[in-house]
């Protein structure tokens, strides 16, 4: 049987992949969630609160004209955290992104409270989104 936080992550990834922002808002993200995106691109930075995080997701979809995709390769979960191995891809202005990222989730009371995104190639990610 999977850990409850693994189930939460799998449901969250499914909601993200299908564009179900209401499920992300109501079932996956805490109201005061923090999301950290490294780098120097226009999307890099810290997003605070559910509206900023969902706005970040919308910006990624907008910049890639809906081509951005994530896969859930694997999830490692315990009572406080989940670590996700997640290939991502997208198209933007003639550029293609293929990245094997890692995301670290802090989870409390069945909701994601903080996320740290770690692209495998930060330089390529910055170039793609710049």
Question: What is the predicted role of each segment?
Answer:
Residues 1-130:
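C-terminal and inter-domain tail/linker signature
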